[in-house]
């Protein structure tokens, strides 16, 4: 299995279920999460809760490196991970991430793009992209700055060092840090509150806030130059080689 979908009352819960691969997002897992969100919309759910199995040691390690090594490092509108992230962002339903364990790389981006993130003290966050030199789109950097602030975003990207859950709370990546035994009840209380609010109003607020937060606010020529740099790095043999080398080291 890659993800489980459960409907309890007003909330749809999507559980990452790829523990043996540290819940790394391959095509199947990314599509399963996206399909679950679209199903929640179709069923009239009021909120989506995104979580992992309680026994998972890593909430998500981000992109599946095996697929990167096989297909190259892709970043286009139809790439499964990107489509999943955009669906989390663009669904009219509030998405709550319930995080009980460390998040890495693309897993941390999921925590960032979720509308509300509730974590436990064990939920450290590490952005490992620059250990391999994987670039992001301008809109992702804009969102990171909007969520965390410029200085903390630089620390995250330029050091690739883990942030404690408390640091994530203080910089805005997490909304709440609670004891492990309080994670489910805290999320349930949020869902109950969402149920009392007007769906159209919530959708408008979410869309408007994201439209502002994800906007880079740069001239077209600067955005074009950033896009060219981004594409050149993705196409470089060096990046493919670093991904392959990391995979080889993990197999030793």
Feature-to-residue mapping (PLM):
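Hydrophobic/aromatic residues within transmembrane alpha-helices
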Residues: 14, 50, 64, 110-112, ...
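A structural preference for short, pocket-lining loop segments at secondary-structure junctions
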Residues: 9-17, 28-72, 87-97, 116, ...
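Crotonase-fold acyl-CoA enzyme core
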Residues: 3-4, 86-200
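Short, conserved glycine- and acidic-residue-centered signature motifs
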Residues: 26-29, 77, 104, 137
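C-terminal alpha-helix plus adjacent terminal tail
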Residues: 1-9, 40-43, 53-55, 160-166, ...
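Glycine- and charged-residue-rich phosphate/anionic-cofactor binding loop of Rossmann-like
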Residues: 22
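Glycine-rich phosphate-binding loop at the start of an alpha helix
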Residues: 62, 78, 82, 105, ...
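Hydrophobic alpha-helical membrane-association signature
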Residues: 29-32, 80, 226
């Amino acid at each position: 299995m890659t993800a489980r979908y459960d409907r309890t009352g007003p909330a749809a819960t999507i559980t990452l279920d790829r523990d043996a691969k540290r819940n790394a997002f391959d095509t199947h897992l990314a599509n399963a999460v996206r399909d679950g969100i679209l199903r929640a919309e179709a069923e009239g759910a009021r909120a989506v809760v995104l979580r992992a199995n309680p026994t998972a040691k890593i909430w998500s390690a981000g992109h599946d490196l095996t697929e990167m090594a096989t297909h190259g490092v892709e970043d286009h509108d139809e790439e499964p991970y990107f489509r999943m992230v955009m669906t989390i962002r663009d669904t009219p339903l509030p998405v709550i991430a319930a995080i009980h364990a460390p998040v890495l790389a693309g897993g941390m981006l999921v925590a960032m793009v979720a509308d509300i993130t509730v974590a436990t003290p064990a939920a450290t966050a590490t952005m490992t992209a620059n250990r391999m030199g994987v670039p992001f789109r301008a809109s992702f950097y804009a969102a990171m700055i909007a969520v965390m602030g410029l200085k903390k975003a630089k620390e995250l990207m330029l050091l690739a060092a883990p942030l404690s859950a408390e640091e994530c709370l203080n910089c805005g990546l997490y909304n709440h840090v609670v004891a492990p035994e309080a994670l489910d009840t805290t999320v349930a209380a949020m869902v109950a509150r969402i149920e009392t609010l007007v769906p159209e109003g919530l959708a408008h607020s979410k869309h408007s806030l994201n439209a502002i937060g994800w906007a880079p606010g740069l001239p077209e020529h600067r955005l074009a130059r950033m896009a060219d740099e981004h594409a050149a790095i993705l196409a470089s043999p060096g990046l493919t080689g670093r991904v392959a080398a990391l995979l080889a080291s993990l197999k030793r």
